[in-house]
Amino acid sequence: MSPRALILVAGIAVALAAPIAARAQTRGELVGPRTISTGLQETSAAVTPEGDTLYFMRSDFAERDDTIMVSHRVGGHWGTPQVAAFSGEWHDSEPALAPDGRRLYFVSNRPVQPGGAPLTTEMGGHRFAGTNLWFVRRQPDGSWGAPVHVDGALNDGAMIYNPSVAANGDIYFSAHRPDSGAAYQIYVARRTAQGYAAPQRVELGDVARNRMDPAIDPQQRFLVYAGNEGDSLGSADLYIAFRQPDGRWGKPLHLPGKINSPALENAPSLGPRFGELYVSSNRRDEVFFPKPRDNTATLQQRLQQPLNGSRNLWRFDIADVLRAHGIDH
């Protein structure tokens, strides 16, 4: 979700009593420095089950021009990304693969009917690109088919963000809806034989807290999301909630280690390996003065590097967090 949409609610820090340990195991790594992660905005990683292809969103700094990119792993490194075959014309963002890799979901302002006007929406007196949920199907030759609009109540309105798909087809997403409170909440649309049921809000606590960008475990045992539960280190941090024996969600826990920072962390997604977590963050390198004197060329080069305050992609390992809550695969 765009930083413009992060209308976060301040609160009193709360103490979280949870068996989260092994903080040293959650140090992250920048994904594809200068290839994937650049001086532009990159967010919303979606990695294929084989681990050899990465889809992500790249945009200008204001995130008014979003495009879905694709990169293939070559020789152990991510190759130069290209515009995905189904993107490049509309405001397309936030790709998410189904666990089996056969569908790729994304949000877009493209018109629902051919020849129509692009979607727009308004919030807090600001007008911006609207979004509905779309998907593409994997074809027998490995390519993607034409984008398909997801019909039904799930796409009511034009503020659907960051889809995440469970193994049974249930779709989690964030949205601003009549029961969202002042900002955003997380919803789930259950897949049925008749299509998708009306979305239900995921009960994670007081709706005065802003919650967005869900990343659902394929078996729906846990949910990672971005927000501020009162103890955020920055404008938004990442939290995890575990499914309880009675089916309800447990108290959200602030993820440990270096996953969160005083910067913005959001748009989490789960990789194909156990415990693999991709995160978008605008954390940056510190600049100390006096610095080595720049000339025009070195200044331009340095300012175009990742970690310049733009959002980049990071990869973390939360396997120990999951094991501490009885999940080992």
Mark where each language-model region is.
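Bacterial N-terminal signal peptides that target proteins for export
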Residues: 1-9
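Bacterial N-terminal signal peptides
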Residues: 9-18
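Signal peptide processing junction and immediate N-terminal pro/mature segment
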Residues: 19-23
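Short, conserved micro-motifs composed of acidic
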Residues: 24-329
